[in-house]
Curated annotation (Swiss-Prot):
Gene Ontology BP, a term: 'de novo' AMP biosynthetic process
Similarity-based family: Belongs to the adenylosuccinate synthetase family.
Subcellular locations according to the entry: Cytoplasm
EC number: 6.3.4.4
Name listed for the protein in its UniProt record: Adenylosuccinate synthetase
Organism: Herminiimonas arsenicoxydans
Catalytic site: D14, H42
GO molecular-function term, one example from the UniProt record: GTP binding
Catalytic activity: IMP + L-aspartate + GTP = N(6)-(1,2-dicarboxyethyl)-AMP + GDP + phosphate + 2 H(+)
Keyword Nucleotide-binding: yes
Gene coding for it: purA
Length: 432
């Protein structure tokens, strides 16, 4: 019987999901994106060649694997077409293998204009968005005024909806945000020019996924960002605009929750965050261990190029993530970045409002007030890069992994020891 796996980030994103999704596509016939947009990147290293993707599922790099963009994704048509062209240039054929949900909300220039203008207006209180229009596009979806992929294929309907939306959003841009408005005719013409390329890929993704599964296909649901950026469960308001947790694999693609059989939580061996928001175990990245993590871990955003904030591993944060996702097993990534550190620290809980708590709180205010409680463990001098078995890891590295398993209560089923596909230790295969 076919089996479906959901891959989610358990921290604030950038956990190394792209490589693991690519590795797992060896055992899947379809890969599905179910939330987010072109605001989150995933980097694959295959045979030493690096490929960065933002919208198209990582499975596209595996010949014969079908890829799906579900209704939970907000779609920038120019960006998905640019990604297709970039892949075509390295010999990867996309259009015949990619299906885009007709219910995807479309990101248009006024969404980007609103996103950028709002961040400028917030000043020091900015959220740290990528400025790509993701949030405003989700707002339109919830307000029931989104232009969806199916609308774009109907020129008359699209033109009417676009005019109505621009009347509304241009009023806000001009009168509240005091910035330039967006031109109707140019927006209309540019969008319609992309329709001939887009149209063959648009369809009923929900039915396609059901048909594939019933025909025996294993499906892999690829989450973007991280669970603590979830709009409901993250450090609100310092969150993204979508649900990043595993449950959204169902609503964001059109399959029932009973079709989600295994939840793989991708967990970095230390903690990082991009942009604003609380981060209890954060370290300064201009010195000491923080600098080591940032430098050795190459901690710069795939999409924005922004330097990531770095800190010690936070087991209390991971407990929250395991809880909200129903994680079956974890994949531990970037263990090799810790090589050479004499002492490691694990955050096991916090002092918060005069009490000791052992799980990350809900919302930014309490999270910002947390004082981390640390447990120290000895590090290791030996290299872990490229290790293929658990026994090949240094004893102290194995002890570090064991301790995290005990603190969180979920097994570590996979360990990534480098960026390439082959640099992976499998203790329990998610698809088996």
């Amino acid at each position: 019987m076919a089996k479906n796996v959901v891959v989610v980030g358990t921290q604030w994103g950038d956990e190394g999901k792209g490589k693991i999704v690519d590795w797992l596509t060896d055992h899947s016939q379809g890969v599905v994106r179910f939330q987010g947009g072109h605001n989150a990147g995933h980097t694959l290293v295959i045979g030493g060649h690096k490929t960065a993707l933002q919208l198209i599922p990582s499975g596209i790099m595996r010949e014969g694997v079908a890829c799906y963009i579900g209704n939970g994704v907000v779609l920038s048509v120019p960006d998905v077409l640019r990604e297709i062209d970039k892949l075509h240039a390295i010999g990867v054929e996309v259009p015949s293998r990619l299906k885009i949900s007709e219910a995807c909300p479309i990101i248009l220039p006024y969404h980007t204009a609103l996103d950028v203008a709002r961040e400028v207006a917030r000043g020091d209180a900015k959220i740290g968005t990528t400025g790509k229009g993701i949030g405003p596009a989700y707002e339109d979806k919830v307000a029931r005024r989104a232009i969806r992929a199916a609308d774009l294929l109907n020129e008359k309907r699209f033109a009417e909806k676009l005019r109505e939306n621009l009347d509304y959003h241009n009023f806000v841009l001009a009168n509240y945000l005091k910035v330039a408005t967006v031109d109707y005719q140019k927006t209309l013409d540019d969008a319609l020019a992309d329709v001939p390329r887009l149209k063959p890929m648009v369809g009923d993704v929900s039915s396609a996924l059901y048909a594939a599964f019933n025909a025996g296909a294993n499906l892999l649901f690829e989450g973007a960002q991280g669970s603590l950026l979830d709009v409901d469960h993250g450090t609100y308001p310092y969150v993204t605009s979508s649900n990043c947790v595993a449950g959204n694999a169902s609503t964001g693609s059109g399959v029932g929750p009973g079709m989600l059989h295994y939840i793989l939580g991708i967990t970095k061996a230390y903690t990082t965050r991009v942009g604003s928001g609380p981060f209890p175990s954060e370290l300064p990245t201009d010195q000491g261990v923080g600098k080591h993590l940032a430098t050795v871990g190459h901690e710069f955003g795939t999409v924005t190029g922004r330097a990531r904030r770095c800190g010690w591993f936070d087991a209390a944060l991971l407990k929250r993530s395991v809880q909200i996702n129903g994680v079956t097993g974890m994949c531990f990534t970037k263990l090799d970045v810790l090589d050479g550190l004499e002492t490691l620290r694990i955050c096991t809980g916090y002092k918060l409002n005069g009490k000791i708590v052992d799980i990350f709180p809900v919302g930014a205010e309490d999270a910002a007030a947390c004082e981390p409680i640390y447990e120290e463990m000895p590090g290791w001098k030996e290299a872990t890069v490229g290790a293929k078995t658990l026994e090949a890891l240094p004893a102290n590295a194995r002890a570090y992994i064991d301790r995290i398993e005990k603190l969180v209560g979920v097994p570590i089923d996979m360990i990534s020891t480098g960026p390439d596909r082959e640099e992976t230790i499998v203790l329990r295969h998610p698809f088996k």
